[in-house]
């Protein structure tokens, strides 16, 4: 299953807020050593929450994509095609097994976009590489992907990312997931006399996330029951108006604690802290 990419459109209000930054309309008189509670409607925070929520949704999708390989070898081209459908006649799917790794490459290309993803999957049992997932207790999953819009004369989005996850204890009641992710979004607003390039870079750590196994059903939801996810976000806007560019940068620290499919999110930045909860999935019964 390929990840679900949710691209938050900033909208007219957000674009006006961005322009307001450069016009001196965004002011903060809080001393630099004082941290206050932020409002969820703060225009500084709204686009960040959109990216965090998108990232959380895509994380569950990534867990699901990895666990799809837990009951069958990912060498079956038709199986891969089903997971990455729909595929056009000019799209490419290749599957190979080499040096203990299953490597899947999928490329979609049409008049609107180009999408490329490579999955690398290795199974182990007692620290020894095995070919069949039915014998494993450990899975290493690596994904690299890139989505590029070809409609560059209008508002559009480009994305690329990298995932490196280890699933341990897969022969038991639950799997423990650890690893890293990198997620980059480039959002381009194209107006008649102005443009905005919004960049989001997220460096993510997945720490001891637990996913329970359902007897008789395997890993049906890939929904985490516990664990912590942390992210550092670098955000920038370059606004060009009347041929004059201006750039604004922001940095954020995100901490997510998961309890039975509910994420408690804390975002820190600009001497403020924002907190909220989000239902991300329905965990398996255990």
Report the location of each language-model feature:
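Bacterial N-terminal signal peptides that target proteins for export
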Residues: 1-11
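C-terminal motif of bacterial Sec signal peptides marking the signal peptidase cleavage site
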Residues: 19-24
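Low-complexity, intrinsically disordered segments exposed to solvent
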Residues: 28-286
């Amino acid at each position: 299953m390929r990840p679900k990419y949710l691209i938050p459109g900033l909208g007219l209000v957000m674009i006006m807020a961005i322009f307001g930054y450069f016009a001196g309309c965004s002011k903060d008189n809080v001393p630099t050593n004082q941290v206050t509670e932020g409002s969820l409607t703060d225009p500084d925070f709204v686009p960040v929450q959109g990216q965090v929520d998108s990232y959380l949704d895509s994380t569950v999708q990534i867990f699901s994509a990895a666990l799809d390989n837990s009951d069958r070898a990912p060498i079956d081209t038709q199986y891969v095609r089903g997971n990455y459908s729909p595929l056009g006649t000019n799209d490419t799917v290749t599957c190979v097994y080499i040096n203990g790794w299953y490597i899947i490459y999928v490329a979609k290309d049409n008049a609107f976009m180009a999408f490329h993803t490579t999955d690398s999957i290795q199974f182990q049992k007692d620290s020894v590489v095995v070919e069949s997932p039915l014998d494993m207790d450990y899975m290493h999953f690596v994904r690299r992907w890139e989505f590029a819009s070809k409609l560059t004369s209008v508002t559009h989005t480009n994305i690329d990312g990298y995932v490196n996850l280890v699933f341990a204890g897969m022969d038991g009641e639950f799997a423990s997931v650890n690893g890293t992710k990198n997620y980059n979004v480039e959002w381009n607003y194209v107006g008649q006399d102005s443009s905005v390039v919004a960049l989001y870079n997220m460096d993510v750590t997945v720490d001891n996330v637990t996913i329970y196994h359902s007897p008789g059903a395997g890993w049906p939801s890939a929904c985490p029951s516990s664990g912590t996810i942390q992210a550092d976000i670098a955000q920038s806007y370059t606004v060009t108006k009347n041929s004059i560019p201006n750039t604004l940068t922001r940095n954020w620290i995100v901490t997510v604690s998961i309890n039975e499919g509910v994420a408690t999110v804390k975002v820190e930045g600009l001497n403020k802290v924002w907190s909220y909860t989000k239902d991300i999935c329905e965990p398996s019964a255990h």
